Regions:
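Beta-strand-rich domain onsets/edges
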Residues: 44-61, 146-207, 212-217, 229-231, ...
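N-terminal, post-signal-peptide region of Sec/Tat-exported proteins
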Residues: 66-102
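Short amphipathic beta-strand segments in non-cytosolic proteins
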Residues: 84-94, 222-237
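Glycine-centered loop-to-beta-strand initiation motif
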Residues: 103-107, 239-253
Length: 284
């Protein structure tokens, strides 16, 4: 997405003989170092890529976190310093996604009952300082027109310090699809919610998706959908006044839908802007 940023691998921490508190401190330092270096932890999309989208009841599913672009991503190992929420919700309710610190997959879940599972990961905010060229380019590419216009009105032409959070979800189906089961809100700051169960759909049908910010519909946001088999052939739409977009999905396979929203950072945040990156994956 941003050609000026260097892609590097996330450091492997799982072999270090550290206590839990030492791991958290080191993890936070590593995350900050990666963010400040402009590595893909910030620069690209983040999504959930389960080891299977169609597990059997009782099966254990690995919940892999990926950071990259166009379905080419580096692993994001489990880091407790980053996790705000890491959950799965099914017909029996919500429970945490467990895992081992430093491991990839970052989480493991056992399918307790057949049906649709909604898996979600919400990160804590991380900070980054961006040059004017890099910040302006990414604001343009992510369709953040309101931010660009506000900076122009204020005569802000320099770089910017930003805090960013990831809000990723994935839909996994165990057993036969059921029209009465669907995606649901997990209460993430920025969230994509499929208003139709994609596992009940066929090729060429419309998938309505709603985008919310702080549990309210977000209008005018750029929403992008891509298929893993041909990620360069993207579908794009702007959310309407109800936060809704509709995508006619032209092929089977794994889909990723994403959106970014940016606001002015709260006082005391030691940053000018706060961004939220939402994603939703499923298989058609």
């Amino acid at each position: 997405m941003l050609a000026s940023l260097t892609i590097t691998k996330t450091p492997k921490l799982m072999s270090l003989p550290l206590s839990s508190s030492m791991f958290r401190r080191l993890g936070a330092l590593v995350v900050a170092a990666i963010a400040l270096s402009g590595a893909p932890l910030f620069a690209h999309d983040m999504w959930i890529e389960p080891t299977t989208f169609s597990p059997k009841p009782g099966e254990i599913v690995g919940v892999r976190l990926r950071v990259g672009q166009d379905f080419l991503g580096d692993p994001l190992p489990r880091n407790p310093a980053l996790i705000n929420q890491f959950v799965v919700e099914d017909a029996e309710g919500r429970r945490p996604v467990v895992g081992r610190n430093g491991a990839d997959p970052a989480g493991l879940l056992r399918v307790a009952v057949p049906g649709l599972l909604v898996v979600g990961y919400h990160s804590n905010p991380s900070a980054i300082e961006l040059s004017a060229e890099t910040f302006n380019q990414y604001v343009k590419e992510e369709g953040l027109d309101a931010v660009a216009a506000l900076r122009a009105r204020r005569g802000q032409t320099g770089g910017a310090r930003e805090i960013f959070s990831r809000c990723a979800k994935s839909l996994v189906l165990s057993g036969s699809p059921n029209r009465t089961q669907g995606d649901r809100s997990l209460g993430f700051t920025l969230e994509l919610v499929a208003e139709r169960n994609p596992y009940t759909m066929g090729v060429g049908q419309n998938l309505p998706v709603r985008l919310t910010y702080e549990s309210r519909p977000l209008a005018g946001a750029l929403v992008v959908a891509m298929n893993r088999s041909n990620p360069s052939d993207k579908l794009t739409a702007r959310s309407d006044k109800d936060g809704r977009v509709r995508f006619r999905l032209p092929r089977t396979g794994v889909w990723l839908i994403k959106a970014v929203h940016m606001v002015e950072a709260a006082p005391g945040a030691n940053a000018a802007w706060a961004s939220y990156w939402a994603s939703l994956t499923f298989e058609l």
